[in-house]
């Protein structure tokens, strides 16, 4: 009989609310020694959030701040703005926008998921194909049942190796 997601998944899953701040999220990353969490609201999976989502948000905010600062630059001036003059302003703009951001603002809203009955080969295929490190296991009604990480699959391989 083929190994299924149910055989490999962890059922004790730490989740986060979509409404917590990114500051609180970072504390949870550190405290739990992980880089991502399923996002759950009313017992249903609504997304997944990882550190790379936060980095993406920072880069987006920086690009936006640079665009706005270029737009408002005095085009009649012959003086080139120096990076030292604009960097603190950009940092302040990015910081204030990120300070009010929540998990909902950065999470992946349509995460790749599998069902508990899916073969583990499908789970591995999704991790590789989508270049992700974790996949939530969900019931047909959207409830989170567990999670499988790439390390869980590596552990499965190690356990199968002859002594």
State where each predicted segment sits.
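Tandem CBS (Cystathionine beta-synthase) repeat/Bateman regulatory domains
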Residues: 1-163
């Amino acid at each position: 009989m083929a190994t299924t997601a149910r055989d490999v998944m962890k059922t004790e899953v730490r989740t986060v609310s979509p409404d917590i701040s990114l500051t609180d999220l970072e504390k949870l990353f550190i405290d739990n020694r992980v880089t991502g969490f399923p996002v759950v609201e009313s017992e249903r999976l609504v997304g997944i959030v990882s550190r790379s989502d936060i980095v993406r948000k920072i880069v987006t905010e920086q690009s936006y701040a640079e665009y706005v600062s270029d737009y408002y630059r005095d085009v009649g001036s012959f003086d080139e703005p120096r990076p030292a003059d604009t960097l603190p302003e950009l940092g302040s703009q990015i910081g204030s926008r990120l300070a009010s951001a929540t998990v909902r603002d950065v999470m992946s809203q349509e995460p790749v998921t599998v069902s508990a009955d899916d073969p583990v080969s499908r789970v591995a295929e999704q991790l590789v194909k989508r270049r992700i490190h974790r996949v939530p296991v969900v019931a047909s009604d959207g409830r989170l049942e567990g999670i499988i990480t790439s390390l869980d699959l590596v552990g499965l391989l190690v356990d199968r190796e002859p002594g």
